[in-house]
Amino acid sequence: MKNLISGVLIIFALIATSTGTATAQKTSMEGSRANRSKVTIEGLVRDVACPIQNLDGTATSMSLKCVTDCLKGGSPIAILTKDGDLYLPISDKMPDYDQRTKLMPFVGKYVRATGIAFERNGARAIVISEIAEVNDVKVRDEGE
């Protein structure tokens, strides 16, 4: 009888734990403690590898072939501002889901993106609500 009661208690504990986990995954970023604000940013959509490794990189020049190859290889996509800040796209749901599809049509282009920005220890991310190409800023393709 004790084994039966113990078994039932374990099953209830597992059900309660799995239900709590499912609820936690469905929550949005409300209540997040990260520094966040509504912003509009402008910058170049590209991979993150080169701007992190090369401090001379700018938001108005790049090698489109290099950027495309890095993204195809799995490098994260980001928006590089003229100030040198990199904003990674994130979703507004938990668990997070891939945001590459939102930025891929803009690779190599200068954009204006509006959304909720999060900052934590120097890392920046943005939940993009609107994005459009900025046509009056020319991006120079420096080749390979």
Residue ranges of each PLM-predicted region?
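Positively charged n-region of N-terminal signal peptides that target proteins for export
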Residues: M1-G7
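Bacterial N-terminal signal peptides
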Residues: G7-S18
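OB-fold and OB-like single-stranded nucleic-acid-recognition modules
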Residues: G20-E144
